[in-house]
Amino acid sequence: ALHGTQITPEDWALFYRCYAQTYAEHGNPPYLNRDFFARMAKDMGEHWVLIRAERSGRPIACSLLAVQGWGGSDAVAYGRYWGSLEHHDSLHFETCYYQPIEWCLQHGVQRFEGGAQGEHKMSRALLPVGTASAHWIAHPAFAQAIGDFLQRERQGMAQYVEELQERTPLRRND
């Protein structure tokens, strides 16, 4: 794992190649461009951790974590982006979950967020939690419609998270 200034321009280029390749394989252009990552490296470089996977000495996959509160007791690592040049069983989980969790343990980061979506993460003991986001919608009627929907969705999502929590693979002491 590389952190902050340890991540070279060549590493960023490799990451973007992996990231773009993964989107291309799903028939989509990447939603973030190379310039976005170049700016993040320049302006917020200390907040990133790059995990590389290699096969026979060649890099084949990368994941990129965002770290908030670095060095503090409330630091959080967020699994954010990933990509691969080759396909191997469990490569995604190794690169995006197992290695980042190991990095967190080694660096005293108490919390790892594996990213939004994906009930498949539960089998890896990444349990669902609510997340928040902020958006500004310029059109008043559209903003109201979205607000109404989100209010209804909130109840359904809370119930769904509760149902998923009941199926945790972790042992409970209650």
Where are these regions (language model features)?
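Terminal substrate-recognition subdomain of acyl/acetyltransferases
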Residues: 1, 111, 116-174
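A conserved beta-strand-loop-helix scaffold within acyl/acetyltransferase catalytic domains
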Residues: 1-89, 136, 168-174
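Glutamate identity and glutamate-enriched acidic tracts
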Residues: 10, 25, 46, 54, ...
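Phenylalanine-focused residue identity feature
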Residues: 15, 23, 36-37, 93, ...
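Generic signal for short, ordered secondary-structure residues
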Residues: 16-19, 83, 99-100, 143, ...
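A generic secondary-structure signal for well-formed alpha-helical elements
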Residues: 19-30, 67, 104, 108, ...
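Acyl-donor binding region in acyl/amide transferases
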Residues: 72-140
